[in-house]
UniProtKB/Swiss-Prot annotation:
CDD domains: bZIP_HY5-like
One MF term in the entry's GO annotations: DNA-binding transcription factor activity, RNA polymerase II-specific
Classification lineage: Eukaryota, Amoebozoa, Evosea, Eumycetozoa, Dictyostelia
UniProt keyword annotations, A-Z: DNA-binding, Nucleus, Transcription, Transcription regulation
Region annotation (Leucine-zipper) ranges: 83-104
Protein name per the record: Probable basic-leucine zipper transcription factor L
Amino acid composition bias (Polar residues), ranges on this chain: 248-257
UniProt-listed GO biological process terms: endoplasmic reticulum unfolded protein response; regulation of transcription by RNA polymerase II
Disulfide bonds: none
Species: Dictyostelium discoideum (Social amoeba)
Length: 530
């Protein structure tokens, strides 16, 4: 069996066990387990210790591995850093390219729109040029026709000669030939060339048969007559030419030529087109300005409408909140202390109402029907009141309560006359309201038996004794047990008997702590002893 005192267990562990001695440890553990499970004759062999050289080699190998791992890590980190820097550069370059692309796209869009506009303008100019060419050709044709007509009329006038001296046997007439040259390209006005100015080209002779027979006889006479006729025709032609030139000059002075008229018309048409273009451009700019102004006005109107709607919604919300608050106040104002099972009443009043006292009517106070119209009302605002407000008003309550118990035998009109606050007795009576009096209280107390000088006949104690161990007046001489920290001592509003206000006649109760006002409780106890 293996024992703890055996030399195998007492041998020290070699330092190589941290690096390479794990096999020996495992062998020892396995041998221990097998010895425990198998027969007791099993023996564990000695642990083989590695040599120092092997240990050094292992250490060197480990160092090299660590160094190579550190190098690989550093290289990986550098590679990752380089990749990140390249990625950042690429992102910057892509952003710049996006910006450039946007700029180029905007410029290309502008150029395309400009080209389209120029193409449209070119088309319109071509159409205008074609239209003007057609007009120009029509005007030239009309001018040529008019000149030809004038020339024909002048030639007809010049072709009618005057021959006063003519023979009966032979009649000869010569007419000059007119040459009309129309230079369409260089000149628009025709040129008149009379051949008779230089030399006669054509001599039209009308010869009768009689003249042919008598040629030899009348040869000299014919020659003389021909010469005379030629001279007369030349004179007539010269006169006609002079008259025509003077008439043309007068016409040119009086009215311009049709060519000038056509040029003036073209200039006027161009001016008209320029003016129309200017007017259209001005209208376009005005339309753009008006559209922008209309858009701004519409936006302003929309904003004003939205603001008005928001204001109306706010007013509606405020009015709804006010109406809800008024509705709640009206609902709370309809609640009285004569109905103890209402959930909206304070807890201390419901406890007092259910456990402490039962109200009853008393002499000298108002009737139950009148009290029913003047129930004590707690608005929601009266339950939230600071202690400073109570400090400010508790002296007035004490003074008024003392004055009332000194003058308790007076009637309701004298006790409520003026602006005096009612006493604690009237408070407790108003708390009852004469509506929820129990039959026991109505049977025990009556108006004939009760008197203001005996507080025991009241049928319920004042609210000061809420939470006390005694039954109210019987324990007035002893100290009060301060079990409850809140009592129903009231702070009342001043009101008039003239009924100037409808809702201000009802007194308001405020919660008061007994721990804050011990002196006030003592004063009230003294008042109850009267």
């Amino acid at each position: 069996m293996y024992s703890p005192s055996s030399p195998q267990s007492s041998e020290p562990m070699s330092p190589e066990s941290d690096y390479g001695g794990g096999n020996s440890i495992n062998n020892s553990n396995s041998s221990n387990n097998s010895s425990a499970n198998q027969s007791p004759q099993f023996s564990v062999g000695k642990m083989k210790v590695d040599s120092e050289e092997k240990v050094k080699k292992r250490q060197v190998r480990l160092l090299k591995n660590r160094q190579s791992a550190a190098l690989s890590r550093s290289r990986k980190k550098e590679y990752i850093a380089n990749l990140e820097s390249k990625a950042q550069e690429l992102t910057h370059s892509t952003q710049e390219l996006h910006v450039q692309y946007n700029k180029i796209s905007s410029t290309t869009f502008e150029t395309k729109s400009r080209l389209e506009f120029l193409e449209k303008s070119l088309r319109s100019l071509r159409m205008e040029n074609e239209f003007l060419r057609t007009k120009f050709e029509d005007i030239n044709n009309n001018n040529i026709k008019s000149h030809s007509r004038s020339n024909s009329s002048s030639s007809s006038l010049s072709s009618s000669p005057t021959t006063p001296n003519t023979t009966t046997t032979t009649t000869t007439s010569t007419t000059p030939v007119q040459l009309i040259i129309n230079n369409h390209k260089s000149e628009s006005s025709p040129l008149l060339l009379n051949s008779t100015n230089s030399s006669p080209t054509i001599a039209s002779t009308l010869i009768n048969t009689k003249d042919i027979i008598n040629v030899s006889q009348n040869k000299n006479n014919n020659n003389n007559n021909n010469n005379n006729n030629n001279n007369n025709n030349n004179n007539n032609n010269n006169n006609n030419n002079n008259n025509n030139t003077t008439n043309l000059l007068d016409q040119q002075q009086q009215s311009p030529t049709p060519v000038l008229e056509s040029l003036i018309k073209k200039d006027r048409e161009r001016e008209i087109l320029i003016g129309i273009n200017k007017i259209n451009h001005f209208k376009f700019n005005n339309n753009n300005i008006n559209n922008i102004n209309n858009i701004n006005n519409n936006n302003n109107n929309i904003n004003n409408i939205v603001n008005d709607e928001e204001d109306e919604e706010k007013c509606k919300i405020n009015s709804v909140e006010e109406s809800n608050s008024n509705h709640l106040n009206n609902n709370f104002s309809n609640l009285s202390f004569s109905s103890p099972n209402v959930n909206s009443q304070p807890i201390y009043l419901t406890r007092v109402r259910s456990s402490s006292y039962h109200p009853s009517n008393y002499l000298g106070m108002e009737s139950p029907t009148i009290n029913a119209g003047h129930h004590m009302i707690i608005p929601t605002e009266s339950l939230i009141l600071s202690s400073n407000h109570h400090h400010h008003h508790h002296n007035n309550i004490n003074n008024n309560s003392n004055n009332h118990y000194h003058h308790e035998s007076s009637t309701a009109s004298s006790s409520s006359g003026g602006n005096k606050l009612p006493s604690l007795y009237s408070i407790t009576n108003n708390l009852g309201g004469g509506n929820s009096s129990s039959p026991s209280s109505s049977s025990t107390s009556s108006p004939s038996t009760s008197s203001p000088s005996t507080p025991k006949s009241m049928g319920f104690p004042s609210p000061i004794f809420i939470g006390s161990s005694g039954s109210g007046p019987s324990s007035s001489g002893s100290q009060i047990n301060h079990r409850s920290s809140i009592i129903g001592l009231s702070k009342l509003k001043s009101y008039n008997n003239n009924n100037n206000s409808n809702n201000n006649n009802s007194p308001i109760l405020y919660p008061i702590s007994t721990n804050q006002y011990p002196s006030l409780i003592n004063n009230n106890n003294n008042n109850n002893n009267y």
